[in-house]
Amino acid sequence: MSGKAQIFKQTGVRWLWLALVVFLADIGIKFIVMENMGYGWANRIEVLPFFNLLYVHNYGAAFSFLSDQAGWQRWLFTGIAFVVTGLLTYWMSKLPAAEKWNNVAYAMIIGGAIGNVFDRMVHGFVVDYLDFYWGTYHWPAFNLADTAICLGAAMIILDGFRKKEEEK
């Protein structure tokens, strides 16, 4: 077996399939939203008393961070996503495939990051469509990629606590 095949079989790189699934699901949902929903608040679909589907453009990062800037943030966030994707992929190549928790976390972040980079490169903005609210307060709209990134980051944080508990 070649060295590259062994790396793929025995290391966390094997979990990159999950990043691909997250990426494909993210761009697939965004395509459906763009093709089937009208843009903006007036075209929202009220699903639950605290949740709407809503097609909006986000020129910033997760939860509209820096969306009011002049456009430089598109390139900043794209660069950050490439660096993070490279680092996480490298770390996955050093982790055993059996270490599922961190590999899944890294793959989710990679898939989400690539999904949002795809939007920035193709559209010049990120498509957001999930709108949660309480009363009149609305959390900034977000998408599957943002969700995957946040869940992956939360898993990494939780892993830090798990390891400290195991050491005691």
Swiss-Prot record:
Keywords: Aspartyl protease, Cell inner membrane, Cell membrane, Hydrolase, Membrane, Protease, Transmembrane, Transmembrane helix. It is a multi-pass membrane protein. GO terms for biological process: proteolysis. Disulfide bonds: none annotated. The keyword Transmembrane applies. It is an enzyme of class 3 (hydrolase). Its EC number is 3.4.23.36. It is found in: Cell inner membrane. Pathway: Protein modification; lipoprotein biosynthesis (signal peptide cleavage). Its main location: membrane. It comes from the Bacteria. The active site is at D128, D146. It catalyses: Release of signal peptides from bacterial membrane prolipoproteins. Hydrolyzes -Xaa-Yaa-Zaa-|-(S,diacylglyceryl)Cys-, in which Xaa is hydrophobic (preferably Leu), and Yaa (Ala or Ser) and Zaa (Gly or Ala) have small, neutral side chains. The chain crosses the membrane at residues 15-35, 47-67, 75-95, 107-127, 141-161. Belongs to the peptidase A8 family. This protein specifically catalyzes the removal of signal peptides from prolipoproteins. This is Lipoprotein signal peptidase.
